[in-house]
């Protein structure tokens, strides 16, 4: 096998198998193993018991194996068994092992005859076994019995295919000798997933139960239905032997005697039997693992990379580290601070592309939602003019004023400034809600420690609420400051003279920068929601909003214009969301009760989210399209008061109206600039500093460290299992690395060498005795991988055969053919207890002059032979 590292391959695969089974998943990694497949009562379980040398598997009629049994055989000086689901217990009585298998099977499948794909992991340590990993699968059945579901045949087949379809699995196809090989369910399933026969090993059981005068010689010689890895025959105990408590070791001795004494099998007795099968499976599994090493290493590395992302927060410490709770607390708090800052400040590292972060949402509040709230409180023209006229009249009293009083201007401005408090405080509330949501998102990584997560959220949320009071006080102070002094000397204020010049202007909309250009305020997709089905139903268009009109096009290329709607006399109203609709809708209508589009009094425009609706409303406000007033207006009284003004009073009202509009715009601009700065300084930046510098101290003072770091049972189990798998994968990669660098690669021998069969069938039928090669050096396994090997890979001089014997073999070539063609292999190893009969014409002691045969000599299978794989 190369070196000691190769001998550790099977235990390594066992360790990975245990790690993955304990996690409850296969980690998408196909581990090399041997799956035992066969019909019901074909003798699969008996073969496994013969390997172990103990009776430990359930027996009975019908389906006995109802869950896959992953059997890990490990060579050890002591003999005991362990189950993965109860690691702490060592079973020395194998009757208890059988009872535990039955109990564990019933625990998952119930006491009826149902099956389950969840495997049972059993590890057997014994001085009588070779390292092997096998999977005992339920026997293939046709008819449901008892409480089995009617599709039991397909359930079992699907379960078997789940295990044998993996390219890394060898298939041990068990077929009884008293059954026609062409009808073998095991070989049929094996051919479905392994049509080339590269992974299939045939096992023929019940050779002693064949009808008198028949034998399975053609099958075992790989003539009838050839497999690349050949067939091995075994003889198990009969039911009478089992009931009579016949010892397995006595059964193995009887098996050995059967093959030595049977005339059809004695010439191949050294290649038959349970010990040879066990040795062959050990060799082939080890070689199979060696061939799978590159792909296995690649899969291990890929799995390790995916695991590193999941265990990043606790991969630097082991579960048995006594200081891990302190490390975990520090690491969790630091990670929480980093995550919070990234979500607020933004980061190019690991950007979330599915939803907006907390910082992006706060930015939208500052620059879309808050300006929208400011503009939404836009005063009504008629109400404002009426208030100005009342203020002028009340200031003059009984006197008739000749000049426009500036006190009326100050009174109206102060009244408008007070209205700013509500949208400003609402902005603070929106930001606080986003901050709290961000804290909850960041603490989701602390879910392993429920108490720590709860305390962290409580402490940070309490601090945010404290900062809320400070921030709101500061914002109210800013508004009071604006109200305390009306600075009419501001550089942006139009002044009295300009206000009089503008008194003749009737259009209050935003001035366009250049006469030849149209200011585009917003573009985007909207759905016209209230077009009747007779006219095509709801349709999506590309809308373009300017300072003068709303246009929509077929697509974003803006080539095919569908309609252009002037903004004069338009207003916005909310529309309730439909019961089955996931769209958010608002409507545009004409205040003069005119149709807006074709025969529609209002256009209902639909967006995907409420945020898009708010953003479009803010854009319409910039264009001068305001929301509909909720309260009913006394239009008659307003008209009466407005139109009853004399021309001089009307000019004074218009002048003050322009002054108020100019000064309120200055205040709005100042508030829009100071609000984000105030909130950032007093709330967001202070919260970040608190998390980085004071949160840990608050956590230590609020509760005991041990209680904070108490894990939920599920999270602790998941974390420990994941860490175990992580370290097992790293250890596996290290072992594979050592093997890869220190193993001397040799050409892999052919899976089957049946040249002895070919030579026997292609020459004279005269029975001859074949000489035997020298014995292999102790401790070295034969170089041939297949269970039915041909001649040895190391040629032996003919003269050396004088001390050994060989049984008679039919159709052995005569001496003329030996000397005529010196390229033939020397005779294969045979049983060393038979007397020597030297073929006539061969002088003893004459060695071959040909060089030793290469170990990678290709296998030749005669095309005339029928094949299972055709």
Curated annotation (Swiss-Prot):
The gene it comes from is DNM2
- Listed binding positions for GDP are 41, 43-46, 59-60, 206, 208, 211, 236-237, 239
Q: List S-S links within the chain.
A: none
Tell me where in this chain the GED domain is found: 653-744
Q: Region (G3 motif) spans which residues? A: 136-139
EC numbers on record: 3.6.5.5
Q: Give the Phosphotyrosine positions (modified residues).
A: 231, 597
| Domain PH stretches | 519-625
Which catalytic reaction applies to this protein?
A: GTP + H2O = GDP + phosphate + H(+)
Keyword match Ion transport: no
Ranges of Pro residues composition bias in the record:
826-855
Q: What is its main location?
A: cytoplasm
Q: Which family does it belong to?
A: Belongs to the TRAFAC class dynamin-like GTPase superfamily. Dynamin/Fzo/YdjA family.
Q: In which tissues is it expressed?
A: Widely expressed. Expressed in skeletal muscle and the peripheral nerve.
Report the GO molecular function annotations: enzyme binding; GTP binding; GTPase activity; microtubule binding; phosphatidylinositol-4,5-bisphosphate binding; SH3 domain binding
Region described as G5 motif: spans on this chain: 235-238
Region entry G2 motif, spans: 64-66
Q: Any other noteworthy remark?
A: Overexpression of CNM- and CMT-related DNM2 mutants in COS7 cells, whatever the mutated domain, led to a reduction in clathrin-mediated receptor endocytosis associated with MAPK ERK-1 and ERK-2 impairment. The membrane trafficking impairment process may represent a common pathophysiological pathway in the autosomal forms of CNM DNM2-CMT neuropathy.
Recorded protein name is Dynamin-2
Composition bias, kind Low complexity: at what positions? 796-806
Q: What is the effect of changing residue 597 to F?
A: Greatly reduces tyrosine phosphorylation
G1 motif: annotated span: 38-45
The record's top EC class is: hydrolase
Give the record's keywords alphabetically: Acetylation, Cell junction, Cell projection, Charcot-Marie-Tooth disease, Coated pit, Cytoplasm, Cytoplasmic vesicle, Cytoskeleton, Disease variant, Endocytosis, Endosome, GTP-binding, Hydrolase, Membrane, Microtubule, Motor protein, Neurodegeneration, Neuropathy, Nucleotide-binding, Phagocytosis, Phosphoprotein, Synapse, Synaptosome
